[in-house]
A protein has these predicted regions:
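Active-site-proximal polar cores
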Residues: 1-26
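Short, conserved turn/kink motifs that form compact alpha/beta structural patches or helix kinks used as
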Residues: 4, 25-109
């Protein structure tokens, strides 16, 4: 794995399930696990264009070291970093349990 600068802290968020007796549905997002050190890189417009997606929002990649917490993160979870909330749109393992990479789209500023 290339040298990565883990220079910011992120918090994973998970929706709490609400059961009203008739159905279960996701509720508010609350912190899940502890804060982790991560590396962040922005996805360039050229990369979006070559992938065939023209999306008018900010897309970023967050890379964290592999851990049981990072391995348990799902597409339905979110990431909070630097006062912004990002929806996870893709998850990739880097190396053999070296790191996990989360492709995200900005949800709230």
């Amino acid at each position: 794995m290339a040298r990565i600068s883990f220079d910011r802290r992120i918090q994973f968020l998970r929706a709490q399930m609400i059961d009203d007796g008739f159905q279960s549905r996701p509720g508010d997002y609350t912190p899940f696990g502890s804060r982790l050190w991560a590396a962040k890189s922005e996805i360039s417009d050229g990369e979006k264009f070559s992938a065939g997606t023209i999306v008018p929002n900010l897309q970023s990649r967050f890379t964290v070291r592999w851990s049981r917490l990072s391995a348990s993160i799902e597409h339905t979870d979110r990431i909070e970093a630097e006062g912004r909330v990002y929806a996870i749109v893709g998850i990739k393992e880097v190396g053999r349990r070296a790191a996990r990479e989360f492709t995200t789209a900005l949800v709230a500023p």
